[in-house]
Amino acid sequence: MQIFVKTLTGKTITLEVESSDTIDNVKAKIQDKEGIPPDQQRLIFAGKQLEDGRTLADYNIQKESTLHLVLRLRGGMQIFVKTLTGKTITLEVESSDTIDNVKAKIQDKEGIPPDQQRLIFAGKQLEDGRTLADYNIQKESTLHLVLRLRGGMQIFVKTLTGKTITLEVESSDTIDNVKAKIQDKEGIPPDQQRLIFAGKQLEDGRTLADYNIQKESTLHLVLRLRGGMQIFVKTLTGKTITLEVESSDTIDNVKAKIQDKEGIPPDQQRLIFAGKQLEDGRTLADYNIQKESTLHLVLRLRGGMQIFVKTLTGKTITLEVESSDTIDNVKAKIQDKEGIPPDQQRLIFAGKQLEDGRTLADYNIQKESTLHLVLRLRGGSF
């Protein structure tokens, strides 16, 4: 299939790829076309930085998707700024930049005046005259941006997809007004919006003050679907997921929605309804699945196996893996479970440090083997 890669200069490169290609493979193709070494490439899709050992399919990158290529600068460094809406901005900075400088860069990118910006790192609000180095902010650190409001207040609206929208409102705004603001931001007509707060559905003519909705309250937005309907998916752990679907959705579509919500790759999902396993190409209508039906989700482990990872604190983590998984993949799974970035992980087995590009099979790591995880310290020189 073809995908596109857009550079910061606005140039678009077209690549021929397979869903099974790893991010490493894609970077090698970009190097062939553009001469940029893979270690200077960072690829972004849907706001996420893509990890080398993962595949295009893992990130649900489909034909004609567009990736963004950001170059990793030698002397400078990149940091990320996350807004309350969940958007992540990438900035090129130097350790010697002041917080004022950083706010000016955010203004250049996003148009937000510095005096409305509050930057938070490691739970601390950053002061304008200090530098990034003063706060020990290093490459690929993430700052959080909170807007300082004048007069009004901010509230949050959380959608069923998990996205959070930030709105500027007054206590005297009516629910109609709020729905109009959501329409401005997201394009959803007010008559398709249902807003919930403290378990109550909010009525159009009433104000935020009537419902005691105060600054930084979170409302929940549920869509009233036209031809659409809700179905439930129950996992083996007993968790129930709610999905917005159409009768004409295929089983593939449903699995993609589950991936969006839960991060489970479609090829590891088996969906069961009325005792039957559902086939990818068929639609919900084919199986007579109607509104508020419940499907059952069973995970397919592929000739997978379990291994254990023991940390220096004595904690043991259990991972589901394949023999063909690379050490990169294993580190990504540890990151998913424990939040430890791969570049801070060293894995040891049988007294040997494991190299990223090699597979578990290369090291004869079999089911129920135990790896040891040692953390690589930032300032360290491993």
Curated annotation (Swiss-Prot):
CDD domains tied to this protein: Ubl_ubiquitin (cd01803)
Pfam families given in the database record: ubiquitin
InterPro entries: Ubiquitin-like_dom, Ubiquitin-like_domsf, Ubiquitin_CS, Ubiquitin_dom, Ubiquitin_ubiquitin-like
Keywords from the named record: Cytoplasm, Isopeptide bond, Nucleus, Repeat, Ubl conjugation pathway
Domain Ubiquitin-like positions: 1-76, 77-152, 153-228, 229-304, 305-380
Superkingdom of source: Eukaryota
Note: Ubiquitin is encoded by 16 different genes. Ubiquitin is generally synthesized as a polyubiquitin precursor with tandem head to tail repeats. Often, there is one to three additional amino acids after the last repeat, removed in the mature protein. Alternatively, ubiquitin extension protein is synthesized as a single copy of ubiquitin fused to a ribosomal protein (either eL40 or eS31) or to a ubiquitin-related protein (either RUB1 or RUB2). Following translation, extension protein is cleaved from ubiquitin. For the sake of clarity sequence features are annotated only for the first chain, and are not repeated for each of the following chains.
Protein name as catalogued: Polyubiquitin 4
Native organism: Arabidopsis thaliana (Mouse-ear cress)
Lineage per the UniProt record: Eukaryota, Viridiplantae, Streptophyta, Embryophyta, Tracheophyta
Encoding gene per record: UBQ4
